[in-house]
Regions:
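Accessory terminal and edge-of-domain segments that mediate assembly/interaction
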Residues: 1-596
Length: 596
């Protein structure tokens, strides 16, 4: 089928320039990384500071920016503190061919970013990149980390602190008094570093950070190749279970919410989970929530409470708990597949006819057990990827499978007009990668989530912008989008929509055009939940994560997605129209459908 398009001048043509500083910074590191040699990271510091990133607003100031530092700390492995060189590549073979034997190095992890890191133990770190978005994400993170590390060191040396006679455990209050910054920020940094906090503070005082970076490879074909390797075990699982020719629903969300909703593992262990909570400290928030739920004083959901507690319960039991949970979920019809490539995106295969109707979350509605058993559909759910890896993944799936029936995207976003934990449903998405704007007939509205949204607020008819990196945006940049009513800032939807375009049309996805998605051969839904507020510095990704209460928006959204799939399969609720395409009316593209 043909997708309606309207050619428009792109931002790159000079009609609109969002930020010369951001563009200069990105161009600087991309050209430097083309070199086959090593690049001193410090050469990027001036352009990083000049950019005025909303995530690193104090980069050029002598004042510490602990929010940006904590953000970087959580997205880099511990070994970065002792590193001198960071080597980036697409696969182990490319690294080994260049004399970097990572297969013999120790694997490393970052707390808040799924990347495959390797630590030589002698000052060299290697990291595998899944897409070009990893470069846009990782390089500014490294620069921010180095800038703030050296600013902390400068203040330590000026204050002569800590001295050799000071206790090894450095209190956050003392850090704030001697170095500046808030006690809360130092406490969060201490939480991030754990028991090594005191030793790490001493290391900062002793060592000026001077990282070097080197890029090996980075071709489009290389990213396509690793995406194919990522998909291969999922495709093999579908073939091995006889699911190859079945209708497929693709969901990009997380690795826990859909599984909890369809398996009932947590609800089956209600007694054990309640006992587990009753044994926590009496001041623990979950103890208070349990009491409030029992007494009817909490608006929260009992099912969501059990899902949240189950994660803590199984985690507390270590590998035994993890193995028990995976086995139970497999028995309930969910197969987990872990990635061994640079694309660290776990996947789950969920055939609908393998599900037990009695185990489904009751909030889905009344289930027709016969229709569920007769459904030939299968859900492939993945943990949301980063940036343009989303395009690579969905395109690879669409090439390999002809029976794609629906695509649903659930992800985190920054909000310019709502609060953390709110849900945003957009019908316009501007993609900075391609410079195109998509006009959607979103499968979801607030009505689909409202019954299950207890703590947050639902906002539909929103406009989203897909950015290249959390760091590659500044205040003027955000102001520009806010004036154009683009209030949802995220990183994956644009690439997904580019892939959807190629599913629906004979051409490759366009660049710099407005695209009408009112008629598609598949069902399409996009939902975001607010995880940070860049207009409020204290409430950024570096400062606050989603808590127990923030989980409410995740489950309301996941329930809406699964309920939509089950309705399309005529398993629950009202049966939709006879075909999956959107209503025949084609809306006119408004003149302000994209930034102008």
């Amino acid at each position: 089928m043909a997708v309606a398009r309207l050619a428009l001048a792109s931002f790159a043509d000079g009609e609109v320039r969002l930020s010369d500083e951001v563009e200069l910074y990105q161009r600087t590191y991309m050209t430097l990384l083309r070199s086959s040699g090593e690049t001193q990271l410090r050469v990027l510091e001036p352009s990083h500071m000049a950019m005025g990133s909303s995530l690193h607003p104090l980069a050029a100031s002598e004042e510490l920016d602990l929010g940006a530092f904590i953000y970087a700390v959580r997205r880099l492995p511990d070994g970065i503190a002792g590193a001198e060189l960071v080597v980036m590549g697409q696969d182990i073979e490319a690294l080994s061919a260049n004399g970097i034997p990572v297969e013999y190095w120790e694997e490393a992890e970052a707390a808040a970013r799924r990347r495959r890191w390797y630590d030589s133990g002698t000052g060299t770190l290697a990291v595998l990149l899944a897409s070009a978005s990893d470069v846009d994400d990782l390089v500014p993170t490294l620069v921010a980390f180095q800038i703030e590390w050296n600013k902390i060191r400068g203040r330590q040396r000026a204050a002569g602190w800590p001295s050799e006679t000071d206790a090894p455990d450095v209190p956050p209050e003392e850090c704030a008094r001697e170095l500046g910054g808030s006690v809360d920020d130092w406490a969060r940094l201490r939480d991030a570093w754990g028991e090594s906090f005191g030793a790490r503070m001493r290391l900062i005082s002793e060592r000026r950070l001077a990282l070097r970076v080197r890029m090996l490879g980075g071709s489009h074909t290389g990213y396509d190749r690793l995406t194919r390797r990522w998909w291969a075990p999922v495709s093999a699982e579908l073939a091995g279970e006889g699911l190859t020719e079945r209708p497929l629903y693709f969901v990009s969300s997380n690795s826990h919410s859909l599984v909890n909703i369809v398996t009932g593992i947590a609800r089956e262990r209600e007694g054990e989970l309640v006992t587990f909570i009753e044994q926590l400290d009496e001041h623990d928030i979950l103890r208070h929530e349990l009491t409030a739920l029992r007494e009817g004083d909490s608006p929260g959901s009992w099912e969501n409470f059990l899902y949240f507690v189950a994660r803590l319960y199984f985690t507390a039991r270590g590998h035994e708990g993890w193995a028990e949970r995976r086995a139970a979920e497999r028995e309930k019809g969910v197969t987990h597949l872990r990635s061994k490539t640079a694309l660290r995106v776990p996947a789950q295969v969920i055939p609908l006819d393998a599900l037990d109707p009695r185990a489904l979350d009751p909030r889905l509605g009344e289930v027709d057990a016969g229709a569920l058993a007769a459904s030939g559909a299968v859900i492939v759910n993945i943990d949301y990827p980063l940036g343009v890896a989303a395009y690579n993944i969905l395109r690879e799936i669409a090439v390999d499978r002809t029976g794609l029936r629906g695509v649903y995207v659930l992800g985190k976003a920054a909000t310019l007009n709502a609060d953390v934990g709110d849900v945003m449903i957009s019908n316009v998405v501007h993609d900075e990668h391609a410079g195109s704007t998509y006009w959607l007939d979103n499968a979801f509205s607030v009505d689909d989530l409202a019954p299950d949204l207890r703590f947050g607020t639902g906002l539909d008819n929103q406009r989203a912008v897909t950015v290249k990196s959390t760091f590659l945006q500044n205040r003027s940049y955000l102001d520009f989008y806010y004036r154009e009513a683009f209030t949802v800032v995220e990183m994956e939807t644009g690439p997904y929509l580019n892939a959807v375009y190629e599913i629906a049309d004979a051409d490759r996805h366009p660049v710099g055009e407005a695209i009408n998605f009112s008629k598609l051969p598949i069902d399409l839904g996009v939902i975001h939940y607010a995880s940070d507020m860049p207009y409020t510095q204290a409430r950024t990704l570096g400062a606050q994560g989603l808590s127990y209460y923030g989980m409410d928006s995740t489950y309301a959204s996941s329930l809406a997605i699964l309920r939509r799939i089950l309705r399309l399969e005529r398993v629950v609720g009202e049966v939709p129209g006879p075909e999956l395409t959107r209503p025949s009316g084609t809306p006119t593209l408004p003149p302000d459908a994209r930034p102008s």
